[in-house]
């Protein structure tokens, strides 16, 4: 077994908390946790601690919540902990070079893609959106660039035809902690090999927007179906009927060679709501109308049949 490392962990959401949990269960010593300040959440907008903070407090690990690292005080607070390494997972704050240089072995990051593909904020969603066959996690030595650091470990898994961003998030949240603990062993015993990224293969996973999730019927059905899975659970692919936003939870592609205008309903029955697109048909199997839970297509047709008559055009 490698020697234990003195680790500072920095992260915020549940995805990060699962990695912190693996570190706590390892033989390494988590000496401090950084997470974003408590934020208002829920209907009452009550200040709420992040999942990472809650887990750290359960294990009596000191928690630090600076707004940023611009002040000398915040930088000194970090330096005083005398850490070997800082592990960063979905922290949400930019780390200046002074912070990256503070731990003896620097900072490493767990990123939700196979770098250099999908650098940036939404790698899980963009991999599904683009129709990638696989994704994974990359553990890299952090530098000042955006996900540009040398790669220390890559773990991969296939993207199944039914995977959504929600399901892939869960899969990577299981894959990442295992890869992280393995990587820490390599770092501790000096066997980790850093591999530079090929910048020519890099692309950027920009943040999702609600506007992007509005279905463009001129796209081909395959692309629309990918969007449905990529934008689940947020911001959810949607279209409009009588100015009502309808969210799409599940869809499939069917061959269609007719000449109906994209956005036109060409069939509606218990097998689905078939809509013409730029190429082939998209078939909706599960939808959500405002104020209701997601429903199968038969329930939708029973309650809102007039919205989905053959020949109607969806916006």
Swiss-Prot record:
Its EC top class is transferase
E.C. no: 2.1.2.9
Catalytic activity reported: L-methionyl-tRNA(fMet) + (6R)-10-formyltetrahydrofolate = N-formyl-L-methionyl-tRNA(fMet) + (6S)-5,6,7,8-tetrahydrofolate + H(+)
Q: Where is the chain membrane-spanning? A: none
**Keywords annotated in UniProt:** Protein biosynthesis, Transferase
Annotated GO CC locations: cytosol
**What name is this protein filed under?**
Methionyl-tRNA formyltransferase
Please give the organism.
Aliivibrio fischeri (strain MJ11) (Vibrio fischeri)
Q: What does this protein do?
A: Attaches a formyl group to the free amino group of methionyl-tRNA(fMet). The formyl group appears to play a dual role in the initiator identity of N-formylmethionyl-tRNA by promoting its recognition by IF2 and preventing the misappropriation of this tRNA by the elongation apparatus.
The record lists (6S)-5,6,7,8-tetrahydrofolate as bound by: 113-116
InterPro entries in the record: Fmt, Formyl_trans_C, Formyl_trans_C_sf, Formyl_transf_N, Formyl_transf_N_sf, Formyl_transferase-like_C_sf, GART_AS, Met-tRNA-FMT_C
Picking any one GO molecular function of the record gives: methionyl-tRNA formyltransferase activity
Q: Which gene encodes it?
A: fmt
Keyword Transferase appears in the UniProt entry: yes
Question: What family classification does the UniProt entry report for this protein?
Answer: Belongs to the Fmt family.
> Pfam families from the entry?
Formyl_trans_C, Formyl_trans_N
